[in-house]
């Protein structure tokens, strides 16, 4: 249990890798651009959708029959969305998350939904998360709760999990204009502290060292040691042995 899908978009490829090791790789549709990711670090890329025909589609109904669920991702909107029902991430007729209108985020399922009257700040990266369990839905923006409600329950559909539109609010269409980064899906309900850590950058869904990023020649995540996770440039602690 835990992370069941993670797309950091650092590979800049027509097939974007799922780093959760579940093999749910995404197919990049249209001609999206690759831009700097939310962290600003070298090698951190994001995907920029044009709002016309760009999307990322998978071949799996990832969100079926989940008693608990967490969706976590970053978005950047260059301008306010035009029109309604702009899909961000989800699975048509099961779990649909997007902009129901230009200023309202919506998490919708056949078992219940929540509308949150806020919009991400234009031209700034915003971390968005939804946590679902037996108590209901909680929506976060930049680590802060912006909406919550009771209800809900496991849902399912025959559609596939997609990002950026094209099978989220409807079978096709409803494309999102903007950039997206670090999409993660969990089959557990993350805690408020977990969400705050993702939003602050103190945590990432998993270490990215399993993926070769263009230009990256060394990486020290400090996960209990000071080893270079992708090479042999291991560090040596000076003055302390407290590596947590």
Where are the predicted features?
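Short, tryptophan-glycine- and acidic/Ser/Thr-enriched carbohydrate-recognition patches
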Residues: 9-36, 192-197, 221-244
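Extracellular glycan-recognition modules
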Residues: 4, 16, 29, 50-106, ...
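Localized edge beta-strand/strand-to-loop motifs within extracellular or lumenal beta-rich domains
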Residues: 124-138
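Short, aromatic/His-centered strand-loop micro-motif at the edge of beta-sheets
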Residues: 105-127
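Flexible glycan-contacting loops in extracellular carbohydrate-active proteins
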Residues: 149-179
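Short carbohydrate-recognition loop motifs
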Residues: 38-53
